[in-house]
Amino acid sequence: MTTTSISARGLWAVLAVFFCAPAAADLRSAEDAYTRHDFTKAFHDFQELAELGQPMAQLDLAIMYARGEGARQSDIYAYAWASLAADNGSEKAKALADKLRPGLAPGSEKIAADIRGEFGNAELDARLNPRIVEDAEHEDRSRCHPVHVYMPKYPEEAASRGIQGGVYAEFSVMPDGRTRNPRIVYAFPSGTFEAAVRQSLLHSEYSEAKPGSAPIQCTQFYNFTWGASADQYPKLQSFVRETLKNAEGGDPQSQAVYGMLLVGLPQLNAPRSKAIPWFLKAAQGGVPTAQYQIGFGLLKGWGCNCEENKGLDWLRRAAQSGQPDAEVTLAMYALKGHPDEERFRQAKLWLEQAAASGSHDGKLYLSALLATTPAANGGDSKRAMSLLDEVYRGVKDDPTVHEIRAAAQANMGDFKAAVNTEREAIHKAGALKWDMTPLNERLAAYTSGQPWTGTLLIF
């Protein structure tokens, strides 16, 4: 992953703080609930995080059991959770466990051991946590280094108002050395810089690979600051140190940001395997985007061994908190291979949820699904084009908009329009130096009066 500066009229980019979306249960919400004496919610949230292996939540849950707050008082459960937190390095938890142990009734330690066995590190490693390996970077990371970076204009409204911010994007680099449909994982402030980043990635060039090679997963950190100069670099170093300090202090959001900095800044240039422990800590702390990062990494073997069942578990947790990237990923996973009616229904449901939240990718992938599915099977070409207009309003040079529109037109039986639209997609793709093979295949289908029902978008 690289850091890209956006320059326009004397503007260039430096690091900005990214904020994590709130989870259904996270340390902050649990602590706030406890402060308000809402012990029922605090207990529920601490328990959810404690069962993921979060040591601070395990200690707080132990304290609540010992005091009978939010649940029936139980020294056995208090001892069990304090012991788990102690196993994870908490000195306060060890002191509490040592205090409780002499007062336990005979046989109580066996009950506590059963709880520890279910939620101890060994069990979580086997059932949920990624297996981090240094050589898990199977892909050629050099392909993520741009040959040419396209610098879009600084957004005019942001410039006129002096707005600063940043975007963290993940994307696939195809064998032709160009990107497709980047996923904007973080954007702050929302709705300001995303379009500029998509334009940059659409027109940037990367190293080509042999035809038929698999796409490679890459990430890029875009930072927008008004009126900054090169002497701001020490502030970047200071920000990294401060973020690490907060991350080491147990703040889940700082842990997520530091994970991004590790793989995002050329100055740190760490492999994904070094960021995974920080993403995991943040995920255990209830940060949905970190849960998505862990889940996606497990699906792809990105920084860890590929373990799909674990990945799907984390993705579902993130999706249940409304994390749109997780929802889209679950949808695309359901559509792998030859999906049956139930898998199609699941995929459509996840995409509907992502689209309803306003997610760009939710609307994009839903429009592609509706455009390439026969009406009898749940497709809806008119709605596909309506969603497309929302996603690509004002965008003129991305072939994807024409690809989806052509598929929708063909699905409605208007093959003449589909052929013309697909030719426009091919014209724009040629200007971007895309591999034309899949586009020409679709053009041939429309020319022969056949709709396209295969996968349209690379994820």
Question: What are these model-predicted stretches?
Answer:
Residues 174, 178-210:
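A short, well-structured alpha-helical segment
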Residues 26-33, 60-67, 98-100, 257-265, ...:
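Hydrophobic face of amphipathic alpha-helices that form TPR/SEL1-like repeat modules
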